[in-house]
Amino acid sequence: MPLISDLLALCKLKVVALILFTAVVGMFLAVPAPYLPNGLLVLSASIGISMVAASAAVFNHVVDEQIDAQMSRTNQRPLPQGRVSKNQALVWGVFLGFIGLGILQLFVNIITVVLTFISLIGYTIVYTLYLKRATPQNIVIGGAAGATPPVLGWTAVSGTQGIEYACLLFLIVFIWTPPHFWALAIYRVEEYKKIDMPMLPVTHGLAYTRTQILLYTVLLLLVSLLPYLSGMSGLIYLVITIALGVRFLVYAIKIYNNPDDKMVAWSTFMYSINYLMLLFIALLFDHYWLISPWEIL
């Protein structure tokens, strides 16, 4: 029997935590201030979305077992080390996905079930099985699956009401994904070359990738203004998102100007995670900041 710690390692809990965070923010933004979403609904949706996200991570481990065994970043994972068999991982992944979708069906709503299932298929089959090995645009196209959590959170609480605002959150995460992963790909480019993975730095070179990171970061700065321009968010969000975006742009320029410095790429990758978290915190803070605690209660 595999250890619980190994089964949890297959779930990529840190990634799931970021997914859950953006989904929960989507839940709160779906409700007009000063109101809060139903607590049981938030809990049920959070558990269901998290379990399906963990299921997708497990399937990713199964599909990428041979690749993981060849990379220093991943060769200590449970499957390459033989601590969990492929069949055990498959059963674990199916269990998580089935229970997660079941919770969403029983306690949330059908549209969230459908969108979550589409995201699961998009990540595990379209991205992991095909795009990841077929095209250097794998991150761009496959990023759609990873950008859905805020939409899932929104629909869990409000269905399709106001879903156009949820689509703005989707767009932000979608545009954020390429510079986030390409920065990591630059840092790990030699390993990707070793396994012949068609990541952008491998197929098109570092210079082209650095340019794409810069262009996508500029686009992200512009797209992040849409919640303000659409009336979804206010000045507090606008100020914070501009500050975060300019800082991200500084990192992108550093990558562009320092082609041989892998640590700049790593620093950019790490900042991109903080960027997304802080941007969603800004959305939430702006949503409630004029409301007194007594109004919320």
Swiss-Prot record:
One record GO biological process: heme O biosynthetic process
Highest taxon of source: Bacteria
Reaction it catalyzes: heme b + (2E,6E)-farnesyl diphosphate + H2O = Fe(II)-heme o + diphosphate
InterPro entries: Protohaem_IX_farnesylTrfase, UbiA_prenyltransferase, UbiA_prenylTrfase_CS, UbiA_sf
Biological pathway: Porphyrin-containing compound metabolism; heme O biosynthesis; heme O from protoheme: step 1/1
Location relative to the cell: Cell inner membrane
Enzyme class: transferase
EC identifiers of the protein: 2.5.1.141
Parts of the chain that traverse the membrane: 15-35, 39-59, 91-111, 112-132, 139-159, 166-186, 220-240, 265-285
Entry GO terms, CC: plasma membrane
Lipid bilayer topology: Multi-pass membrane protein
Keywords recorded for this protein, A-Z: Cell inner membrane, Cell membrane, Heme biosynthesis, Membrane, Transferase, Transmembrane, Transmembrane helix
Molecular functions (GO terms): protoheme IX farnesyltransferase activity
Keyword Transmembrane: yes
More details: Carbon 2 of the heme B porphyrin ring is defined according to the Fischer nomenclature.
Family named by the database record: Belongs to the UbiA prenyltransferase family. Protoheme IX farnesyltransferase subfamily.
Function: Converts heme B (protoheme IX) to heme O by substitution of the vinyl group on carbon 2 of heme B porphyrin ring with a hydroxyethyl farnesyl side group.
The name this protein goes by in its record: Protoheme IX farnesyltransferase
Lineage: Bacteria, Pseudomonadati, Pseudomonadota, Gammaproteobacteria, Candidatus Pseudothioglobaceae
Encoding gene per record: cyoE
